[in-house]
């Protein structure tokens, strides 16, 4: 069968692979476009395997929501350039929507979820790797499924937040989600802060005090320490922080004024916890030249 330009074009549009790759696939499969597409998919899987050990620390946080059900997914790429590629962005949206419509509890479970096309998330990932030429990883999935007030917020594709409120409205929930994105509080309220953390901070504050302060009566010393600890606890709790949309009040005051309560939240930031590889090209050249 003759391999025409229109056949190559059709395969390119269908698979996103390069022109020469599509032509080769059609030649290898006697012009059968379905077999050629499958051949390219298998080639994509091979490329994915070769790239699997490369660090993917850039990427995007994507979200999907339907009522009180919402998800955040983190999908990583190797470079910020690919993180802005339309194929990558489309893939992250596919992953988020697939997560929303599945029962997958984490990223590992999500890999085997089937799309409407019949392929799995893992198979689609491999196909996108073939298009963009970088290692991609579906790294994290978090979800909230509740009858309460739920908001999903993503800032610049880099930080995502899910927050659940009992009471309040959509505007308040979104505002609280924006605050969490900006301020990254580890805990909701003071009672959530581990006792070990408080004890350690007390120890540190006491060590920092002057001998003159340490010589003060026990009850005064306790008041000084308690004041410092209270300030620290406010800094690490959502409720204790000044509300970014109205710094005249704390988040707790804003929430209680609306007759609401924050039940919990999830926050993801692209690449957090991943050690990025810092290339030292000078050292690499020296090593290859036997000078290091």
From Swiss-Prot:
It comes from the Bacteria. The keyword Protein biosynthesis applies. Residues 79-82 are annotated as: Involved in Mg(2+) ion dislocation from EF-Tu. Gene3D superfamilies: 1.10.286.20, DNA helicase RuvA subunit, C-terminal domain, Elongation factor Ts, dimerisation domain. Keywords: Cytoplasm, Elongation factor, Protein biosynthesis. GO terms for cellular component: cytoplasm. Coiled coil: none annotated. It is found in: Cytoplasm. Belongs to the EF-Ts family. PANTHER family: ELONGATION FACTOR TS, ELONGATION FACTOR TS, MITOCHONDRIAL. Associates with the EF-Tu.GDP complex and induces the exchange of GDP to GTP. It remains bound to the aminoacyl-tRNA.EF-Tu.GTP complex up to the GTP hydrolysis stage on the ribosome. This is Elongation factor Ts. It comes from Xanthomonas campestris pv. campestris (strain B100). The gene is tsf.
């Amino acid at each position: 069968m003759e391999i025409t330009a229109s056949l190559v074009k059709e395969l390119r549009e269908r698979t996103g692979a390069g022109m020469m790759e599509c032509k080769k696939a059609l030649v290898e499969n006697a012009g059968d476009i379905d077999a050629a597409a499958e051949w390219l998919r298998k080639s994509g899987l091979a490329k994915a395997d070769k790239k699997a050990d490369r660090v993917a620390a850039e990427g995007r946080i994507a979200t999907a929501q339907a009522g009180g059900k919402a998800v955040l997914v983190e999908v990583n790429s190797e470079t910020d350039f690919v993180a802005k590629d339309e194929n990558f962005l489309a893939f992250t949206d596919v992953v988020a929507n697939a997560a929303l419509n599945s029962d997958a509890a984490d990223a590992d479970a999500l890999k085997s979820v089937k799309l409407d096309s019949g392929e799995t998330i893992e198979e689609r990932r491999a196909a996108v790797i073939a298009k963009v030429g970088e290692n991609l990883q579906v790294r994290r999935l978090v979800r909230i499924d509740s009858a309460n007030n739920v908001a999903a917020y993503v800032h610049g594709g880099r930080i995502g937040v899910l927050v659940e409120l009992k009471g309040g409205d959509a505007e308040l929930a979104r505002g609280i989600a924006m605050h969490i994105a900006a301020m990254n509080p580890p805990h909701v309220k003071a009672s959530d802060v581990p006792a070990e953390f408080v004890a350690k901070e007390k120890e540190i504050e006491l060590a920092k005090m002057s001998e003159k302060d340490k010589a003060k009566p026990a009850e005064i010393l306790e008041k000084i320490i308690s004041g410092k600890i209270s300030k620290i606890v406010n800094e690490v709790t959502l409720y204790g922080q000044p509300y970014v949309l109205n710094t005249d009040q704390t988040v707790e005051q804003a929430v209680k004024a609306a007759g609401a309560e924050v039940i919990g939240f999830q926050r993801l930031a692209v690449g957090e916890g991943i050690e990025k590889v810092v290339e030292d090209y000078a050292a690499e050249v020296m090593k290859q030249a036997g000078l290091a």
